């Protein structure tokens, strides 16, 4: 089972709200997930980002790979000291 950290879309039409989730790579975008490790609201000014740093570190140490978008969100929040591997 390959595990990814990716965005799951929620909210209303034209008002997206995303959960940052740990999920099996074969699950649908908004489908079953293992754990919610953060939220991202791009509509708010400035964008609201809430991360569970310890859980993200745990999953990445366990082999979970962030998608390109999640990797950029984490990098902008100062989560990495070096560039991580991408899913």
Curated annotation (Swiss-Prot):
One function term, GO molecular function aspect: structural constituent of ribosome
One example of a Gene Ontology biological process annotation: translation
GO cellular component: cytoplasm; small ribosomal subunit
Keywords: Ribonucleoprotein, Ribosomal protein
Coiled coil: none
One Pfam family cited in the UniProt record for this chain: Ribosomal_S16
Entries under PROSITE patterns matching the protein: RIBOSOMAL_S16
Family annotation (InterPro entries): Ribosomal_bS16, Ribosomal_bS16_CS, Ribosomal_bS16_dom_sf
NCBIfam families named among the record's database cross-references: S16
HAMAP family linked to this entry: Ribosomal_bS16 (MF_00385)
Protein family per UniProt: Belongs to the bacterial ribosomal protein bS16 family.
Protein name, per record: Small ribosomal subunit protein bS16
């Amino acid at each position: 089972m390959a595990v990814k950290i990716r965005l799951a879309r929620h909210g209303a039409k034209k008002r997206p709200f995303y959960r940052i989730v740990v999920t099996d790579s074969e699950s649908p975008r908004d489908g079953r997930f293992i754990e919610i490790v953060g939220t991202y609201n791009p509509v708010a000014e400035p964008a609201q980002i809430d991360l569970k740093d310890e859980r993200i570190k745990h999953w990445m140490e366990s082999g979970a790979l962030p998608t390109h978008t999640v990797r950029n969100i984490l990098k902008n929040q100062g989560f990495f000291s070096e560039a991580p591997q991408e899913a």
